[in-house]
Amino acid sequence: MTIPSNRPRVGVLALQGDVREHLAALGDAGADAVPVRRADELATVDALVIPGGESTTMDKLARAFGLWEPLRARLAAGMPAFGSCAGMIMLAARVVDAAPGQETLGVLDITVRRNAFGRQVDSFEADIPLTGLDGGPLRAVFIRAPWVEETGPDVEVLGRVPSGRHAGRIVAVRQGAVLATAFHPELTADRRLHAFFVAMVAAQARV
């Protein structure tokens, strides 16, 4: 994928999770990547990545740092976003097995199941073919990952587990300017998915 000549400013929600890895991947993919911990930092970015981590903890920290309502407002206004693992849960409209009191940002018309693939000891890797991504399947790392149980009519399914006991489970989706994966693309050296998102952000900026 061709990296855009301009450099979109992409934030990574830096409350918990694989922040450093996402920043490095976004930089390699052609973005001006910056950590976001405060509302004033959120206001300076063109798009946001919500990393893996623990979704209930990130929910609480976003509120504690005064980021929850600004996040909702920016997303409602059309800011592009990319959520990986816990980030997918935070972007989803509905969560099965949600923790008591857990809320989400609700911008993706999907139902996700928390920890669907099992516990930490059940972590695994798989090669996932992704719609729109050239170069063959993407090596995907699943760690206490969710999966998508239902999608709304405006949601495009980009990837499913191709084989094994979880074959057919939805693990990558897109709805407009919002992208989400159940796996951790930042934990491999393959930057294609981050480049795909950076290109999405650049295209949105041209509209």
Curated annotation (Swiss-Prot):
Binding site for L-glutamine: 53-55, 114, 143-144
Cleavable signal peptide: none
InterPro entries hit by this protein: Class_I_gatase-like, PdxT/SNO, PdxT/SNO_CS
Molecular-function GO terms, alphabetical: glutaminase activity; pyridoxal 5'-phosphate synthase (glutamine hydrolysing) activity
Coiled-coil ranges (or none): none
E.C. no: 4.3.3.6, 3.5.1.2
The keyword Nucleotide-binding is assigned to this record: no
Pathway membership, UniProt: Cofactor biosynthesis; pyridoxal 5'-phosphate biosynthesis
GO terms of biological process kind: glutamine catabolic process; pyridoxal phosphate biosynthetic process; pyridoxine metabolic process
Matching HAMAP family: PdxT
Function: Catalyzes the hydrolysis of glutamine to glutamate and ammonia as part of the biosynthesis of pyridoxal 5'-phosphate. The resulting ammonia molecule is channeled to the active site of PdxS.
Family (UniProt): Belongs to the glutaminase PdxT/SNO family.
Annotated protein name in UniProt: Pyridoxal 5'-phosphate synthase subunit PdxT
Species this chain originates from: Acidothermus cellulolyticus (strain ATCC 43068 / DSM 8971 / 11B)
Organismal lineage: Bacteria, Bacillati, Actinomycetota, Actinomycetes, Acidothermales
